[in-house]
Amino acid sequence: MILSSSLRPTILVVGDLMIDHYIWGECERISPEAPVQVIDVKRETKTLGGACNVMSNLIALEASVLSCGVVGEDLAGRELLGFLQELGMESKGIITQKGRPTTQKSRIIASNQQVVRVDWENKSPISEESEEAMIAYIRSKLSLCDAVILSDYGKGVLTPRVCQTIIQMAKTLQKRVLVDPKGRDYSKYRGASLLTPNKKEAKEATGIEINDEASLKKALECLKKECELEFSVITLSEDGIGIFDQALERIPTIAQEVYDVTGAGDTVIASLAYGLSLGYPLRECALFANAAAAVVVGKIGSATATHGEIAEYLHSSHQGESQERILSRDSIQKIAKQWRSRGRKIVFTNGCFDILHAGHVQYLQKAKACGDCLIVGLNSDASVRRLKGELRPINSQEDRALVLSGLEAVDYVVVFDEETPYELIRAIEPDVLVKGGDYEGKEVVGSDLVKEVKLIEFLEGRSTSAVVKKIQGS
């Protein structure tokens, strides 16, 4: 799982800035004037919406955020700037355009259900003067950013000129541009790093009805090719997230209760940008974004998800205990760096763990007690065969990794193919290296790379070889 990092990526968010206005009340009667509900208002609230909600999500993830967009000379515009100031954000990139209203969406909520929405907005393209001012600001800030998000709600801010200018400038500086798109014509996004349309939006853009894995792959490939993307992503609501890098993968949804899907797309693109800016692979970023979205849809209104909420949600829903803990070498190296930055003690051990038994479990429990985070290096199938012979392993590396990742003592599992874990230890840089008591008086591989080596006695009479012999004997 992507952890809170001492490294704070700087992300520029450009798009349609909005105010989300909520009127909360109760409904107990029908109007005598017309067959409509009467809402007894109890309170009202205003929050940041649209591209501003993307910013709020990034701030909740502890990223540094720069903003760029257009507001009107009105109360909603002044309120929006005030909300951003409360979040500690500067507003130099926000342009005020005379005669143009600030977008505000008013929602009436009764008994935790949305009854109706009223919109104040102007969807026409912004003026050339506003375009020029936005581009000038972005040009001055882009070199300071790790990534750019274009949050398009179709309100006229992200014109073809603005989009293409940003994408070309970002390419020159080797910065990623992530787009939450709107409309049928995606040509203005061509050359971006990735798009995050939902299933309906993807169908409108590609003409492909997504109803199975084959059509999902076709739509993702179409978007990647036609828009010249680095990756393609489609959000699938209750079916999770579909991603395509070199191959298709669908990340299943983990939402338990859905109260309001408002702003879930904002959470997804913010989480993807955050993870990619820290150097995580797309798959892990999608897993993280999926979990963040699950937190958000369990709240009313445009909401955000913190690292703590995401971790708690994954733990309570028993998700990520397997797929989130089995990592590549590159990913575990980044995660180990994050643990160290938080002052945590990293423990490493390794082995084949072919047929898991009580001796293994006790050994791993004692290893975990040596620090805060236990990383297990698991010999690949090829590595086990070289060590144990052609009849081993009994269980595949995928099965062995999954079983290990389900143990409470194990934080992460990473498979290695070499005969020894030396290079893996070098990459992780653990504080403590743990081996079995049978290494007493022997050289421990990787001992020169760590501060401390701990030898732990195995539970007597328990071994995989003994289990295999017992099975063969029966």
From Swiss-Prot:
<dbReference type="InterPro" id="IPR023030">
    <property type="entry name" value="Bifunc_HldE"/>
</dbReference>
<keyword id="KW-0547">Nucleotide-binding</keyword>
<keyword id="KW-0808">Transferase</keyword>
<keyword id="KW-0067">ATP-binding</keyword>
<keyword id="KW-0418">Kinase</keyword>
<dbReference type="GO" id="GO:0097171">
    <property type="term" value="P:ADP-L-glycero-beta-D-manno-heptose biosynthetic process"/>
</dbReference>
<feature type="region of interest" description="Cytidylyltransferase">
    <location>
        <begin position="348"/>
        <end position="474"/>
    </location>
</feature>
<keyword id="KW-0511">Multifunctional enzyme</keyword>
<feature type="active site">
    <location>
        <position position="266"/>
    </location>
</feature>
<dbReference type="GO" id="GO:0005524">
    <property type="term" value="F:ATP binding"/>
</dbReference>
<comment type="subunit">
    <text>Homodimer.</text>
</comment>
<feature type="binding site">
    <location>
        <begin position="198"/>
        <end position="201"/>
    </location>
    <ligand>
        <name>ATP</name>
    </ligand>
</feature>
<dbReference type="InterPro" id="IPR014729">
    <property type="entry name" value="Rossmann-like_a/b/a_fold"/>
</dbReference>
<keyword id="KW-0119">Carbohydrate metabolism</keyword>
<comment type="similarity">
    <text>In the N-terminal section; belongs to the carbohydrate kinase PfkB family.</text>
</comment>
<comment type="function">
    <text>Catalyzes the ADP transfer from ATP to D-glycero-beta-D-manno-heptose 1-phosphate, yielding ADP-D-glycero-beta-D-manno-heptose.</text>
</comment>
<feature type="region of interest" description="Ribokinase">
    <location>
        <begin position="1"/>
        <end position="321"/>
    </location>
</feature>
<dbReference type="Pfam" id="PF00294">
    <property type="entry name" value="PfkB"/>
</dbReference>
<dbReference type="Pfam" id="PF01467">
    <property type="entry name" value="CTP_transf_like"/>
</dbReference>
<comment type="similarity">
    <text>In the C-terminal section; belongs to the cytidylyltransferase family.</text>
</comment>
<dbReference type="InterPro" id="IPR029056">
    <property type="entry name" value="Ribokinase-like"/>
</dbReference>
<dbReference type="InterPro" id="IPR011611">
    <property type="entry name" value="PfkB_dom"/>
</dbReference>
<dbReference type="InterPro" id="IPR011913">
    <property type="entry name" value="RfaE_dom_I"/>
</dbReference>
<dbReference type="GO" id="GO:0016773">
    <property type="term" value="F:phosphotransferase activity, alcohol group as acceptor"/>
</dbReference>
<comment type="pathway">
    <text>Nucleotide-sugar biosynthesis; ADP-L-glycero-beta-D-manno-heptose biosynthesis; ADP-L-glycero-beta-D-manno-heptose from D-glycero-beta-D-manno-heptose 7-phosphate: step 1/4.</text>
</comment>
<dbReference type="InterPro" id="IPR004821">
    <property type="entry name" value="Cyt_trans-like"/>
</dbReference>
<dbReference type="GO" id="GO:0033785">
    <property type="term" value="F:heptose 7-phosphate kinase activity"/>
</dbReference>
<dbReference type="GO" id="GO:0033786">
    <property type="term" value="F:heptose-1-phosphate adenylyltransferase activity"/>
</dbReference>
<comment type="pathway">
    <text>Nucleotide-sugar biosynthesis; ADP-L-glycero-beta-D-manno-heptose biosynthesis; ADP-L-glycero-beta-D-manno-heptose from D-glycero-beta-D-manno-heptose 7-phosphate: step 3/4.</text>
</comment>
<dbReference type="GO" id="GO:0005829">
    <property type="term" value="C:cytosol"/>
</dbReference>
<dbReference type="InterPro" id="IPR011914">
    <property type="entry name" value="RfaE_dom_II"/>
</dbReference>
<protein>
    <recommendedName>
        <fullName>Bifunctional protein HldE</fullName>
        <ecNumber>2.7.1.167</ecNumber>
        <ecNumber>2.7.7.70</ecNumber>
    </recommendedName>
</protein>
<keyword id="KW-0548">Nucleotidyltransferase</keyword>
